[in-house]
């Protein structure tokens, strides 16, 4: 409860930021899938700290170890796939003050209120380190979707603070465009300005947020389980469960509410192959909670990192007023590292719904 | 799968727009709750069609019948509570053309693609009629939350098309303010302009959308189950499962991404009673996925109604190009009737998490 | 929680023995299944009280009404199928004393202890009346299994008190053999003695139990989800959730523990069609938690009916000693009516696992 | 799906018999439980191979490592507790023939039929080695039940082949009695004969089965969730998911069907403390699916070990007739090592239902 996600393609993550390690069990993966452990590691490398000067300087190898579920390390058995990443480079000293003073807008105070206890340092389960299990599992989901349906999932940074990339075409953008720079914005001129902004804000001891966009190209048609497990509903939950998220949009999103029905509706076009085809894609690839085969497009708002070096007002665990200045090594902006996290969560939703659709609607 | 929602306080809805009826089973409701069936009916009356001239003129009594789970019609037994509303006033003729031509941005085409079959008329499960079960169940959740924790849930229309109410204080607004006008916007001067806009757009045979805001006052502290069932994640899923939703925000939302961490963080204040208290509420009442006791504030984007009287390009079920003009009796704007739906979905999430928190964290 | 069963083919039952009605929602049924409502009613007729002089003389028509999920009353839409049976012929007076004195070995005392409240009469959810929803849903599962895989499910009474039928061949017995007599034992000579025994014990104001056997012929191969949702584990749970059950066996069962491995093992035989074939079937059609295609054979122990006319020692709800003699119209032996219940629960397990297998293992 | 068990206190196991290791994640454990890792290891030691001359001579240390969920290695955080045991002492050579010839009454053939692939050696997930995760998780459940409700769970061998212990009093038997001999039968004279029987049958290259009995003393009252998650139904599923089980009984079990209602009913006795008390315990501590506070007593049938040294008829993976004689190091009788497995599964069910009862019925 709470640390598991999905119904048929189901993952369970474990691990605190400091302790033996973090990891995940992937349950329900179809048997006889060719699985590349290198691809899993590659996704983890996109997520890991210390990958560039605009991320936290913490150095962690984040080497994944697959404990079960594979034959010869390359073919799924249909049994649970357990993956573990050992914790390294621990400096609990960094977090000493934090154990006493509650970090504003962080999870310290609420974990204490909920559980009456909490991990002594580093954010415990609320640390971004927890997302390792998600990214590793998401890498498997991606390979499943690719092999079963030719589906591609790609995310990128669309806005940092108030610097927005407006020329990206979700139909065409490639992984190499995204990975071409350290901020993961495929519009290179804008990316440069984003990096400068992150540097500047980081120098102030402050932080910033922004917006990540994600596209699913060639999704299977018919995914989504009305009325509660509509595809957009499960996507919303998936990304809103990532740390630091504040908003979710699909297709036309909040701006779409400014249009009239006649402007917003996506006219159906005749197609040669019987697939549904629409003139516009305000629906974002999902209608009535079910994928129609057009690209699925979502956007996710990430707030500025809560932990900053600037001194802030807060209280300590006795409820007394105090001040706090973060001493840990934190990202001034989480978005570059959050790109693979968003892709992973989207992949997990799609993989789960692929199997659910297969379960209910493929008998005849 | 798909028609059930919640873990411990769990609902399952059933019913097409045309057929024997629609309804819901509520499972897991605590025993010995004083339940007012009148309050359930009152919520359904806020949702029902024909309640004002800016909603669909369809007349449906939507009278709820409670089949099980109550002693003397007023106290819960702890067993499943089944509620049914019979379908009335059916005019399947209205939908005749729609069975052939797929309505743009509606669910006809995707239901057909997914299931290979669909209800012959009226939208089937994709009809807003399905939300009757949600609203009835939400009314029970509200009473549970009120009696167990003194929690209040209130939603209202914040924006219609581009007319926005900017002076509403989520801490103070009352149900009577919301119900004071037919558009359910508590700022009366703005409400008047909203009604005029809906009338004007309706006369054009077109439709419009907007934004609903919802507050939870006096939520229990500690609700939310990291890392996947964070409270905001479950809220996002809950409201994004409502028909016509395109976006979700909590607290500072998308706008919050324009702030720096030092501006966005909510400083903790010393409090007399040991409860957490923050100087600002950019977090929207949830930190680290767990409620901190401050008001929970969310916003939901609703697109313009898909079915309009204006003629539109589309295809028929054979894939041939055709045009379609909606002849049914539809809302030119769903928001006034969606207000109780949003409250219901929020109440269901809170009730479920209250029981989940009780289950895991109240033994000692 | 508690009133739902299954994962993909999932049912939720509701209703007390007295009140508005009882029923069930079936979620996840594949679309485009030809469904005969008459067949559902036929199963309910096998279950209903008053069907013969050895069952309770209560007369209830138990007429099922399908509220949703069907097109033209005969084809599934893939959406939830809700079925309701109205309660009739209520004589709450019969149960007056029982509201005060706890019936020994019945659920009165434990429901009160658990919930702190209970239905005022008739056993509430603990009544056999609750099984109506199971049998109706099971009838759908049977039709699904028949159409998808040619699977047949058949149960019968194997023992009443100490009168046992020993000549039944699970491979060959037919529904007509079972329905040939009122006790539902396909060995007619033994059946006669069983009826006499039930009559005799009933005349004493007492009751008796026995054993029901059930076979699944032509099950799909590969059903069952190790390691916890092994097919026999889910079958055990399914039938042990029926009222009055005390034991479950599969294949060789308890007697099989008296054999040595060399005697108990089922040798595999070469087969022409690639299907698995075994020389014996001590496994009862399931190996390693997975169906091997051989007939699945289980047995279920039912205790003597708890409510009897004979006076018994007990306590009242204040904890004071008292005596009680049942005045309601109860079955002296539940087994004849439990036969369709066992079939229904077995069908529900198989249908669910068929979809689960389809979901995980049919992509390529 | 399939490798997870429980709703609120939920475990997910992973790992093949050969590979990186086996383990479990325990989700939903209440925070602030004092947890002894030594006690977990002690339970694993009762389960491990090589513990006596009547078990398999494989030597495995089965040393548990706790990766997450604990503060200072002794207090639960309320977050997932991950535990891993590394695989050692692998001799895949032993299983070479088995990869080709299907072992009769083992899981080789059905895993192949279901998944189209299987672990190359040692039984994969079907190996008893998988139960390590269950026993480790069960040890946590035991500590939870003890601290929260004073509950004790104890199992023992009641019968081996046809040698039965008939003088054991479930109310009084102690762990030390069970652990006093290597066969884990608390009746020492009978135990001696059981050991001799196992030795004799083992010398023949054959195997034997038997019956394990288990008692829960001082269970919380009110556990169990009618109508499907009755406590006995979940217990049945729990133990029937263990390898080699063929039957389950509660209380009077199959023999109880030979009694009349007047003989079988458990008369309620007045009690001083308001707790329910019964004159007899044919119900086995559960009535209407809910614990009444009396000891819960169950029995489980285990078949003779499938893998034997004697030559047997079978087929190979091409469907051709062949013979097979087990060469691996296997237990001639699984029961001594299965005792802690039964206790673990029972503890997991009770812990889960304790939290579920707390969740629904403890708000007021």
From Swiss-Prot, chains A, B, C, D:
Enzyme Commission identifier(s): 4.2.3.5
Cofactors (names): FMNH2
Parts of the chain that traverse the membrane: none
Pfam families recorded: Chorismate_synt (PF01264)
The protein's annotated pathway: Metabolic intermediate biosynthesis; chorismate biosynthesis; chorismate from D-erythrose 4-phosphate and phosphoenolpyruvate: step 7/7
Residues involved in FMN binding: 125-127, 288, 303-307, 329
Cofactor binding notes: Reduced FMN (FMNH(2)).
Top-level EC class: lyase
Top-level taxonomic group: Bacteria
Molecular function in Gene Ontology: chorismate synthase activity; FMN binding
Presence of the UniProt keyword Zinc in the record: no
Catalytic activity: 5-O-(1-carboxyvinyl)-3-phosphoshikimate = chorismate + phosphate
Keywords: Amino-acid biosynthesis, Aromatic amino acid biosynthesis, FAD, Flavoprotein, FMN, Lyase, NADP
Gene3D superfamilies in UniProt: Chorismate synthase AroC (3.60.150.10)
Positions with a binding annotation for NADP(+): 47
Example GO BP: amino acid biosynthetic process
InterPro entries: Chorismate_synth (IPR000453), Chorismate_synth_AroC_sf (IPR035904), Chorismate_synthase_CS (IPR020541)
Cellular component GO terms, alphabetical: cytosol
UniProt cross-references to NCBIfam families, sorted A to Z: aroC (TIGR00033), PRK05382.1 (NF003793)
Subunit field text: Homotetramer.
Function: This reaction introduces a second double bond into the aromatic ring system.
Entry similarity comment: Belongs to the chorismate synthase family.
Protein name: Chorismate synthase
Species annotation: Synechococcus sp. (strain CC9605)
């Amino acid at each position: 409860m709470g640390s598991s996600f999905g119904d048929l393609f189901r993952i369970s993550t474990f691990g605190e930021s400091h302790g033996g390690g973090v990891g995940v069990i992937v349950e329900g993966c179809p048997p006889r899938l060719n699985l590349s452990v290198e691809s899993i590691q590659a996704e983890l490398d996109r997520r890991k700290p210390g990958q560039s000067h605009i991320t936290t300087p913490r150095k962690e190898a984040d080497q994944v170890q697959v404990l079960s579920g594979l034959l010869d390390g390359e073919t799924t058995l249909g049994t649970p796939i357990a993956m573990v990443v050992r914790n390294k480079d621990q400096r609990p000293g960094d977090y000493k003050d934090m154990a006493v003073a509650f970090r504003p807008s962080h999870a310290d105070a609420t974990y204490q209120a909920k559980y009456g206890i909490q991990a002594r340092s580093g954010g415990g389960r609320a640390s971004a380190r927890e997302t390792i299990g998600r990214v590793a599992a998401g890498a498997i989901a991606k390979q499943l979707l690719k092999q079963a349906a030719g589906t591609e999932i790609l995310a990128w940074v669309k806005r940092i603070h108030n610097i927005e990339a407006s020329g990206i075409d979700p139909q065409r953008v490639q992984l190499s465009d995204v990975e071409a720079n350290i901020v993961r914005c495929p519009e290179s001129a804008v990316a440069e300005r984003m990096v400068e902004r992150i540097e500047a804000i980081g120098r102030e001891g402050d932080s910033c947020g922004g917006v990540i966009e994600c596209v699913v190209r060639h999704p299977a048609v018919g995914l989504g389980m009305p009325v509660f497990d509509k595809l957009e509903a499960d996507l919303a939950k998936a990304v809103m469960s990532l740390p630091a998220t504040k908003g979710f949009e699909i297709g036309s999103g909040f701006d779409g509410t400014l249009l009239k029905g006649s402007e917003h509706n996506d006219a159906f076009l005749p197609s040669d192959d019987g697939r549904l085809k629409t003139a516009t894609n305000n629906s974002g690839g999902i209608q009535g909670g079910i994928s129609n085969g057009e690209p699925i497009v979502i956007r996710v708002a990430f707030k500025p990192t809560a932990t900053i070096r600037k001194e802030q007002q807060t209280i300590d665990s006795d409820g007394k007023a105090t001040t706090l200045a973060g001493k840990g090594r934190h990202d001034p902006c989480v978005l570059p590292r959050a790109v693979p996290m968003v892709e992973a969560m989207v992949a997990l939703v799609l993989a789960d719904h692929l199997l659910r659709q297969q379960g209910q609607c493929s008998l005849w």
